Design a protein with these regions (language model features):
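Polar, low-complexity loop segments and adjacent catalytic/binding residues used for recognizing
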Residues: 4-288
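Extracellular modular ligand-binding repeats in secreted and cell-surface proteins
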Residues: 289-394
Length: 394
């Protein structure tokens, strides 16, 4: 579902590069819903009719991961995000109930200038290291003795012990905690990062948090104070744009990711399936205009006719020795569109190029027919272009 106003203003851009031109086009905020707004990468598929959750067509990560291998998957929003305007993302996720020493690593909600292909190769924000300069919100459900943050959070491989926090990767990809929240603690401490990501309850209506069921994650950004807020499992975390190493001038890809390293580390099969209701996910953001298909127009360039005297031609005759051909010039106008609706919202500076030179038409002509008894004489003293008739003598 895409929402946009019925009427849009059309802008004409001054001469500059396309990045500057699109940045001056102010589009309205819009809300999109559904998995058709995302591209899938890696180990991601659709579970049409889950038997344990009251939902259909769930997006599933880490399914049927071969024994002794790492599972990794991502969905990437089709348009880029900027932080000069507000951002609000809501998605329901259901965690795996496997032990956190062999099950899934968790959920990573990532902002990065790199794309999902780089994520598949380098990793994200759920382990000790991933792709360079990425940042986002991490729900960690998998313990690794190689990850200093897991140790700091006192995850320690105990069943269903997890945590959530904002994190950033440095230029080498090393992942560290930023923003609010105290490492360790308890599930009842609102200032603690600690969560029970799943449990063994058989009562879904006891009022407690059950992470294996579909629960909402809200990730929002307030542009006025440059602060991110994440809400999950009854707790709230915050981090600033600066703490995450992001800035307002750049555009970022937005990824929802999950992975399963425990299966590969243990060398035995372990279930690491993580599921999300991507079909019901909503994202409110302000899109940036994108380059569309340029508009082109052509215009005729008329040919010129040149007349040249040819003494070989009989007086009063003409001959076309080169036929004239019209030329053509093409004007190309950059077009900018709303990436959500495809609607034209602006024009760039037109450029005109001669695509075909005109060919002159050349006409040869003979001299004038001289009457009998008439003689032309050149007078160097006469004004230029003048002609004087002098009567002859009999």
């Amino acid at each position: 579902m895409n929402s946009a106003p019925t009427f849009m203003s059309l802008y004409s851009m001054p001469a500059s590069d396309s990045t500057n031109e699109t940045s001056t086009i102010n589009l309205p905020a819009t809300t999109v819903k559904g998995r058709n707004n995302y591209d899938s990468y890696g180990n991601v598929d659709i579970q049409e009719n889950p038997t344990d959750l009251d939902a259909k067509n769930l997006t599933r990560f880490n399914y049927t991961q071969p024994t002794g291998t790492f599972g990794v998957g991502a969905v990437q929003f089709k348009n880029q995000i900027t932080f000069d305007n507000d951002f609000d993302f809501n998605i329901r996720v259901a965690n795996n109930r496997q032990s956190n020493t062999t099950g899934a690593d968790g959920w990573g909600f990532i902002f990065s200038k790199n794309d999902a292909n780089t994520y598949l190769k380098d990793g994200g924000i759920l382990r000790e290291k991933g792709m360079a300069d990425a940042a986002g919100f991490r729900i960690d459900t998998g313990y690794s003795n190689k990850d200093p943050l897991d140790k700091t959070q006192k995850q320690a491989g105990q069943g269903y012990r997890g945590y959530a926090t904002f994190v950033k990767n440095d230029a080498q990809g090393n992942t560290s905690k930023v923003g609010s929240g105290n490492p360790g603690g308890s599930a009842t401490d609102p200032k603690s990062d600690f969560i029970y990501y799943a449990d063994n309850t058989t009562n879904d209506f006891d009022g407690k948090f059950h992470g294996q069921k579909l629960n909402n994650v809200n990730l929002k950004y307030n542009a006025s104070n440059e602060t991110f807020t994440a809400t999950y499992a009854g707790k709230t975390w915050t981090a600033t744009l600066s703490q995450l190493g992001l800035n307002k001038k750049d555009s970022y890809n937005f990824l929802v990711t999950s992975s399963q390293h425990g299966n590969g580390d243990s060398g035995t099969y372990a279930d690491g399936v993580m599921r999300t209701d991507l079909e019901g996910a909503t994202l409110t953001y302000t899109p940036k205009a994108q380059e569309g298909t340029p508009e082109t127009t052509t215009e005729k360039i008329p040919y010129e006719t040149k007349r040249e005297f040819d003494p070989k031609l009989a007086p009063g005759t003409e001959e076309v020795v080169q036929k004239g051909e019209n030329g053509e010039k093409t004007t190309t106008t950059p077009i900018y569109v709303n990436p959500t609706t495809g609607e034209k919202v602006g024009e760039g500076t037109p450029t005109t190029k001669v695509t075909k030179d005109p060919v002159d038409e050349i006409v040869h002509y003979g001299g004038e027919k001289v009457p009998q008894g008439h003689k032309d004489e050149f007078d160097p003293n006469a004004p230029k272009g003048s002609k004087e008739e002098v009567p002859g003598k009999p």
